[in-house]
């Protein structure tokens, strides 16, 4: 505990976890130094279990010895605790509500579907992919104009303007090209959802995302390994 208090900001997570990447993005956007503790999700540490005794999942952020769990709550905590750097949640209450709404929409209605596409095959995979495209179309038609109301729905993302919803979308579909290569499927069609396509590519062009992203070949290896394990016996969930 003394070491963690001294280090002030410690993130317990996993290199391959999109949920951990959310927190790393938020910390880097705010230029907050932090220590990363790699957790073995098959053999969770007693420290992790002590810090998150309810869900027993990553990520957990420890600030001044006090743990915060659940990635979306952690990001809000970071934004409210450190006033330096860009605002991850808009100051305007109405815009903040819209960013929260669409971040929650992606979390609730898209995350599990994308994971199902990676983990399944045959008719189950086909059905999940159809649903993914339907949700992306909703974001294209209804979400972008609210997320990017300042630019008339035109996706523009920089290190200075990246918000909660950008972070959530980034950690889901930033590596969409690797998903498509591993699966042999088209997930994001620029002709059908040009706005979403432009949004994700704008996110990928930011320096904070480039600096945090592993090499493309490594992403392919991670996805292939995850898919292979997923087509074996059912995996337990360790992330939130």
Curated annotation (Swiss-Prot):
Residues annotated as domain GST C-terminal: 92-226
What does it catalyze? Answer: RX + glutathione = an S-substituted glutathione + a halide anion + H(+)
Cellular component, GO annotation: cytoplasm; cytosol
Residues recorded as bearing Phosphothreonine in the entry: 161
**InterPro entries of this UniProt entry?**
Glutathione-S-Trfase_C-like, Glutathione-S-Trfase_C_sf, Glutathione_S-Trfase_N, GST_C_Tau, Omega/Tau-like, Thioredoxin-like_sf
**Gene Ontology molecular function terms on file:** glutathione transferase activity
Q: What residue ranges are annotated as transmembrane? A: none
Q: Which residues form the GST N-terminal domain?
A: 7-86
Please give the biological process terms from Gene Ontology that the record holds. Answer: glutathione metabolic process; toxin catabolic process
Annotated binding of glutathione, by residue:
17-18, 43-44, 57-58, 70-71
Pfam families with a match to the protein in the record: GST_N_3 (PF13417)
On the tree of life, the source organism's domain of life is Eukaryota
Q: What does the UniProt entry say about where the protein is found?
A: Cytoplasm, Cytosol
User: What Enzyme Commission number does this protein have?
Assistant: 2.5.1.18
Keywords for the protein's UniProt record, in alphabetical order = Cytoplasm, Detoxification, Phosphoprotein, Transferase
Give the family per the record: Belongs to the GST superfamily. Tau family.
Q: What does this protein do?
A: May be involved in the conjugation of reduced glutathione to a wide number of exogenous and endogenous hydrophobic electrophiles and have a detoxification role against certain herbicides.
Would you tell me the protein name for this molecule? Glutathione S-transferase U9
Q: Which organism is it from?
A: Arabidopsis thaliana (Mouse-ear cress)
């Amino acid at each position: 505990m003394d070491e963690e208090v001294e280090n002030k900001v410690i993130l317990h997570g996993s290199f391959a976890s999109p949920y951990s990447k959310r927190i790393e993005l938020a910390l880097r956007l705010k230029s907050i130094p932090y220590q990363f503790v790699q957790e073995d999700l098959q053999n969770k540490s007693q420290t992790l279990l002590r810090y998150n005794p309810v869900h027993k999942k990553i990520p957990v952020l420890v600030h001044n010895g006090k743990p915060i769990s659940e990635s979306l709550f952690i990001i809000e905590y970071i934004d409210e605790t450190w006033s330096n750097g860009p605002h991850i949640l808009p100051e305007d209450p109405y815009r903040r509500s819209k960013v929260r709404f669409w971040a929650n929409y992606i979390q609730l209605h898209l995350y599990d579907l994308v994971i199902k596409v990676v983990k399944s095959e045959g008719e189950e995979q086909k059905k999940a992919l159809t649903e993914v495209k339907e949700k992306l179309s909703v974001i294209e038609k209804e979400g972008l104009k609210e997320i990017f109301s300042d630019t008339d729905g035109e996706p523009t993302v920089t290190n200075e303007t990246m918000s909660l919803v950008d972070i959530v979308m980034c950690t889901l579909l930033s590596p969409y090209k690797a998903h498509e290569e591993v699966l042999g499927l088209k997930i994001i069609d620029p002709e059908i959802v040009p706005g979403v396509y432009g949004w994700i590519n704008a996110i990928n062009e930011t320096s904070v995302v480039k600096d945090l992203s592993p090499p493309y070949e490594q992403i392919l290896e991670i996805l292939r390994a995850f898919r292979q394990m997923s087509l074996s016996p059912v995996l337990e969930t360790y992330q939130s």
